[in-house]
Amino acid sequence: MSTQTAFLRRDPMTVEPWRETCGQIRCLIEERDQAAAEVHHVEIENAKLHYHQRTDEIYYIIDGEGSMILDDETIEVHKGVVVYVPRGVKHKAIGRLTVLTVCIPRGVLNDVYELE
């Protein structure tokens, strides 16, 4: 059995936010934590259409309502909805949304290809 720490606790309010492709982001579990995935708390704001070559994303809508563009389709989203975005799918969230994104595998911040 490993002696490595088996857990990580991080409060979003203690993490310094910065502007990224989707809006204001706080990395709760990041690449340097060596977990299997990254977890980000994102305030959607002027998001840009983009895709990832190596990363799948799961969006959990914490608060708000809006829509998401997924390739050529637009879907409605609201608090409590989960959206799975496979790698290669062009996507963009629209509206006043607070989301939790789970990015698998880790390293998504080096795997963003903006289209606008």
Language-model features: where?
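Extreme N-terminal tail/first-helix region
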Residues: 1-19
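Structural motif
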Residues: 58, 65-67, 74, 90, ...
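Short hydrophobic/aromatic-rich beta-strand segments that constitute the beta-sheet cores
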Residues: 51, 68-70, 101-102
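Ligand-binding loop in jelly-roll beta-barrel domains
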Residues: 87-112
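Short, conserved beta-strand element in jelly-roll/cupin
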Residues: 42-45, 53-68
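A short glycine-rich, His/Asp/Glu-containing loop-to-beta-strand
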Residues: 14-49, 102, 111-113
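Short acidic-glycine-tyrosine-enriched beta hairpin
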Residues: 72-88
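A cytosolic small-molecule/anion-sensing beta-strand core signal
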Residues: 62-63, 78-79, 95
